[in-house]
């Protein structure tokens, strides 16, 4: 066994410092996506669906509630299962909620179901955020954390491009091609 390997649960693992370069960017990219979907893309979505600015503000302000309650949600992450379990569960719930959002766009009561879908995304995003922070604090050694600060920030900013610029551009192009708003957004969220 070389000097660059450690034994974790009886399994030789390469030096953790090098493996951080693989999981930190993807983890922080996925950390920023729900924020962008909730706090930016939803505004454009509701605007294009014809809601007034007052209704959009009132509706989307409720999506902040799970983030305010993060300390309470953090108790679930610590108390039950592993952090990786919560990360994977939250990502699956977010993906299923986006599919539900895509299906709700074509319904008559689309507004109610879109709010429910966005709220489920908000709760899952808050749990996801807590689990990522706790996992990072546990896995990244204290001396190495300053090295990864820039990597985390760049990955988080890339999530804004991936989560807002690309989908909204795609939805706009689909609106022009189809000449209708609802099918464009339904296609986007699926």
Q: Each predicted region: which residue ranges?
A:
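Helix-loop boundary and gating motifs at the non-cytosolic
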Residues: 6-67
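Transmembrane alpha-helix termini and helix-breaking/packing motifs in multi-pass membrane transporters
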Residues: 75, 102, 161-183
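C-terminal ends and interior cores of transmembrane alpha-helices
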Residues: 88, 92-109
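Glycine-rich segments within core transmembrane alpha-helices of 12-TM secondary carriers
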Residues: 67-70, 146-172
């Amino acid at each position: 066994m070389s000097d660059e390997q450690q034994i974790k649960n009886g399994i030789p693992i390469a030096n953790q410092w090098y493996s951080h370069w693989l999981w930190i960017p993807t983890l922080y990219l996925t950390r920023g996506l729900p924020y962008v979907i909730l706090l930016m893309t939803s505004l454009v979505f509701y605007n294009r669906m014809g809601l007034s600015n007052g209704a959009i503000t009132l509706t989307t302000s409720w999506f902040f509630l799970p983030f305010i309650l993060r300390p309470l949600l953090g108790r679930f992450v610590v108390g039950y299962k592993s952090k990786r379990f919560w990360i994977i569960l939250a990502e699956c719930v977010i993906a299923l909620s986006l599919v539900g959002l895509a299906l709700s766009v074509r319904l008559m009561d689309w507004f109610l179901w879109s709010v429910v879908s966005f709220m489920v995304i908000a709760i899952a995003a808050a749990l996801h955020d807590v689990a990522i922070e706790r996992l990072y604090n546990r896995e990244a050694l204290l001396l190495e954390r300053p090295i990864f600060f820039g990597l985390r920030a760049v990955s988080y900013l890339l999530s804004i491009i991936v989560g807002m610029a690309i989908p909204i551009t795609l939805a706009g192009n689909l609106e022009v091609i189809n000449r209708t708003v609802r099918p464009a957004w339904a296609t986007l969220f699926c």
